[in-house]
């Protein structure tokens, strides 16, 4: 999947996620084959937060590339301490800007293979169903979406 295609798809998923009435959800964009290479958008009680290199449940964290630290800092991310992740509460509400920020954070932080197919994971079942519909609408095909959930 090329960056423009991935960002358009991500915008559709973000539109559904941000419109959700639920609080306390997470939406994780990750790179298949690179465990721990991810960006998590979450909506805790304090507002929206982005975390680069969050890790996921029992998966090991993947430290971001040292060359990415300047880019992350320039884009409002802080961290890199004991856990090695970077986070920001300065989350753009424009869908195109948010999709680009998430995609660029993965590109700078983890250098995934060019044209990688992103995967999403979420903690809100309604988002999974709605995201599948957004993916199908975008792709105009009837394949499953690589979205994972847990209970």
Model-derived segments and spans:
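Structured alpha/beta or helical-core interaction and ligand-binding surfaces enriched in interleaved
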Residues: 1-151
């Amino acid at each position: 999947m090329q960056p423009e295609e991935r960002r358009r798809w991500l915008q559709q998923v973000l539109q559904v996620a941000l419109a959700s009435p639920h609080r306390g959800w997470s939406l994780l964009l990750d790179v298949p084959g690179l465990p721990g290479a991810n960006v998590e958008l979450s909506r805790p009680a304090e507002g929206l937060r982005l975390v680069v290199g969050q890790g996921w449940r029992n998966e090991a964290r993947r430290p971001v590339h040292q060359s990415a630290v300047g880019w992350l800092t320039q884009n409002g991310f802080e961290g890199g301490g004991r856990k090695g992740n970077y986070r920001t509460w300065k989350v753009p509400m424009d869908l195109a800007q948010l999709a680009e920020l998430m995609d660029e954070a993965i590109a700078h932080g983890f250098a995934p293979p060019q044209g990688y197919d992103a995967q999403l994971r979420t903690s809100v079942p309604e988002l999974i169903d709605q995201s599948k519909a957004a993916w199908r609408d975008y792709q105009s095909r009837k394949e499953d979406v690589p979205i994972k959930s847990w209970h």
